[in-house]
């Protein structure tokens, strides 16, 4: 309309939109706009516009599993079948007469033959502590094209870069391309990591559920649980266990005190309920097989779906899994090869061959391997104990 | 100086009115009681006698709640065959532990001449020491003889001195003298022809009231020396016991009884509807309320009425789950204070009340309202009529009432229902923000909860205000006095005690509604030890020493 | 030790002709050639039990009454059909209250059990008739009676002596097993038997306990004296247990010690848990009877205002009976009806367990009389009149079975009186005020 006052342009009131509004409505409009201007100018100072209070979400990670794509019969991803356990590999090396003798005509359980299968280095070395001293048939690796995970190196085709080694990429089951998950390639056809075997990762998850100490993720500076542009994300380790209901599910709303000397911080953003974080190097502790271990993940980043009610979350931790960290766990659980069906020398060889991150400056060989781990979490109160005053505070404005 | 004098005069007056006896109305007393030990008392007595590491593994028959208290039910409780079987089993197990190699050095005061034969002298020393403690009074000579005989025969039969002791001890643990706390009377020197509680029964009454256990050595000695028959001697013991940390146990036992915590044993919550209500939550809920009570009433010498408004409590890890609050020490107990505007205020809003008085899968305004009335206001709600027609509730036009308030509308409008439900539902409806497991909620089936109510003409909004209403209601404190006195004497007050009860209520008010002071008032009174005259209760002649009339 | 027990030595009592009566254990050598009676001509011992469920049936869905004494089971009671020939079904017996309140889920069953209407919850005005029966026939067994519940709550017992105390029910299968078949159990089929000298010592200790207690009881008032009487009864039962431990028990053909239920067997008010608990408890109870541990038993399938619920449902059975709308098409409350059917299925489990035990020429059920009863005719209205009752088992041939008996409005106590007479009690009148009766249900008495 011509002659519209300047201050009426650009103010969408919604009253009589698109029609010629009656005079009293127009007058009303003018009043409302005038009022708005007065408020904005601070003349009516008792009407203040306070910034929305920032909120915090505390999460405890309840389970950690390799994000492993598998089909029920395994044929798509493992056309050559699953890997053989070290005991089977060893037995295959024997002549039929030797095999018959050592198994006492097949009556002895292979778990009992475990020590023979382990200590078969040329000088009797344990081949999980010294995997390079023997040459075993190679690891059966994933041949399929699909995997969960994230594009870690930023390339489309996995070509070598100053920080990565050349490797093949995957496509997610939903069709997202450029996925780096060499770790899956290495162990995706090993029984112990797959759902049916579930051994190597279900043991630590079981320990966690039975009162173990979880890793905590504290997200602060949240404007809105669905969308927040800049949040702080801290990783802690707790000294308190999780509480289960009678069906074995972890309950939300527990309180967790943070352990001293374990802290990693980064930034992130929440878009449509999904939190993504800026990569940093993180050591993730866990307890399994009667010992403390850790997964050292370089360039670790989260991609977490936050439930709208703020009670749970699920998603991925992706990054480059440091091979030394991996092997220091494997060499101590070597004896599980009979039930998890892995062969240490073959596994060691494959994971080094297929590693694609952080090349050694001297040798050029990659020392970390791209990986994706699926995690689940429930919400809880993260308790910070101030050593000086022994006061405890829980972050204000908990999200619910 | 004048101020001091004024206070001093006021104090003296108060003392004169409420502490000195002459101002105290007479009580005719009730019949002598014979009260079965509660499970808690049994366990505590064994621990006091033989040490905390003696295991008591067995189960105890439940007591019937009578006139609001299990302790009054204890005065009527019998011992059934199956209960006796259990007492026998427990007795043998306890006795076996007492004499075993780990314990006999400490618990048997002498060594026998031979381990595999009777030794009358050592057996006598053992039973002479343990007998009076077990029976809570001196052992009669013939009883001691009998015990030495029985254990001697046993020892000879199984060629084991200690086993012989254990047989005798086990027998003692299943006699009525042990299992029941009985009122023994003796002739009253101040009232010829009348009877009074004897000193040892006084000691037992006092000890079970204040500490929920048998009299300790000092109290037994006071009984023996006749101190408990004098006001001064009695007050000295009462003050000693009130100052002891063992008072906590007595106060906890009373409130545990009054609040009906025995029903926690069979409390079940549907694990699908309330997955978070696990066993550790149920256990901690009771503990939370009992600690709230002892913190306020004993440690802080607070006003009883503040139990219904206080926001100060304690939290444990499992409770933090249900209350949805941070707990700074999840593996223990921490003080916790709810914010000033929080609906959680007072013990009625704690889990031990709202979760206990609910159904397994939903809340219940009626159960909660009834519980407030019966527990805290001592008002008996009549039983529901037998022939009630529920067709009114089952309105076929609205088969799914969205909120409890809507569902209970018929309760309050139908004439046959309204009379009773009017006095229950409005209180309970104020607590509807707490679901069947005690968790806070603002909506039920997507409809916002309206937590307004009215009690005896007083309107209020929400749980915290309900607490204030109970705080301010004069019946609340007289109910507590009534209950505590009934707990103390094992019977409801009798008709002739009207003035005495009024006196107690006035004293409670004078002392700022402090429970330890009320306990002192009761424990040092004549009324607490008064026994109805012989002939009123039974026709049997009193025995010369230590028999009940 | 006596190798072959002669009838005479047992009759005289192994304790050398003492005054203690020893119940006759059932030996095959005592049976007549037909296995239907003792060689002396006396009938086989009859066992008595009660089985209680809360909240009745859905009216019109329990039985169809036919001509004469014929009847058929309907939907609620379908599971009982295989046992119809053992069951008498009583309808139209009423509960006059003489002005006492109809205390919901209380008056209904106590009137017929105690012969008296209670005046308040927790008031048990006189002994329930199972106690009168067990006092008469149960003294010589290891247990005078056994009370069990499937609900997990020891207060769910309807057996009481009338002093205001009830006989607590056993809620835990593991504890029940330990009590029955644990260290104190004497296996009747074990070849060797050595009386434990320690038992004799315990007997002398109990004797001293009784002496002690007698002087204690001497000075009590009358109300407390009644409680002491119960104490002495309990001590006597313990003495009886010890007596039995001093003799080799007679072999019991059907006695097979069952496996122990796990210590962590779930107990609770979720309906399927309760059904399972009931099944386990039934097995233990039946074996206890088959092993001659008791002659009287009481099973509470549920509390009277049954708190059972389907998992995930927020309403209990009791709440549903009041709040569930009557389905317009079906004409009844569907979920409440579902619970009634589940109750009867469990009753069938109970009855079947007795029917599976062979005894003489027939089964243990043939030598039992079980009183199956409930607290209301129509739970929705707490209706007191026409509360359904059943007798199950042939009582050793002393009663006729398979009949429907119409009460014509007579008091429920007629059934209790009949049962006491069948069990051999010398009682010709029972109950107070309008519940007083001297008319047994002669139609079922042989």
Model-derived segments and spans:
Chain A
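Extracytosolic secretory-pathway proteins
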Residues: 50-400
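Sec/Tat signal peptide C-region and signal peptidase I cleavage site
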Residues: 45-49
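Bacterial N-terminal signal peptides that target proteins for export
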Residues: 16-32
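Bacterial N-terminal signal peptides
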Residues: 30-42
